[in-house]
Amino acid sequence: MKFPTDRPVKVVMLGAGGTGGYVAPYVFRLLHMLDRPARFVVCDGDIVEPKNLDRQNFVPADLGENKARVLAERYSTVLGMETEYVPSFIEKLPDLMELIEPKEWELNPYSTKRTKEMVLLLGCVDNNKTRQLCHQAFHQSEELIYIDSGNGKYTGQVVCGVRRNGRTIRKSIGGVHPEMLKDTDLFPSEISCAEAAQEDPQSIVANVTAATAVLIMVYNILTVSYTHLRAH
């Protein structure tokens, strides 16, 4: 399906770890090369731990630092872009709705016409409770592009949902895999240290593959104005 290539862009990414850490540097570069206003907001409440260094996009100097802040400051500074990040988990609907609210821009100084941002929500938190929250936000949005990625050690999926004029044009992850909406998952902040330690680690290959699928969709939406809506 077609997407506009002349509107300002806002990308909001939930999760700056396994997948988000590899998505971030290339989204920053992609937005930097656009000839229109673009913003990138990275959100994550987690900190960099030693166990993250082998499979996530961090280095020893990042240990103990907030993941969203590390990624946002590192790449926005290098590219001369505004640094925007939220150093906490997004777990409440009003907070998410505020993040994905499109800003209006005056692109022509000689005209009073204002243009709304095209908003992309990237779900890089492999957690079904967060997907349920994003599903709610998606269906309450007048317009939104919601790309969700999820992967295990060897398999995964990336699904792009589209809302336009208050209608669902393409189903999001919750519509494609409705079983995820029934899962009794916990938000990241609700998971204890013991439970987190027992989680099966994802492989770096799966993380990079999922990130690449997300980036292909984002690139095609913003530059080619067309994309396939699922990747497995």
Regions found by a protein language model. Give the residues of each.
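E1/E1-like adenylate-forming module used to activate ubiquitin-like modifiers
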Residues: K113-T209
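A structured beta-alpha segment of the ubiquitous adenosine-cofactor-binding alpha/beta core
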Residues: A68-E117, V125-N128
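Conserved small/polar residues in nucleotide/adenosyl-binding loops
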Residues: T227-H232
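Mid-domain beta-loop-alpha active-site segment that forms a flexible
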Residues: Q202-L222
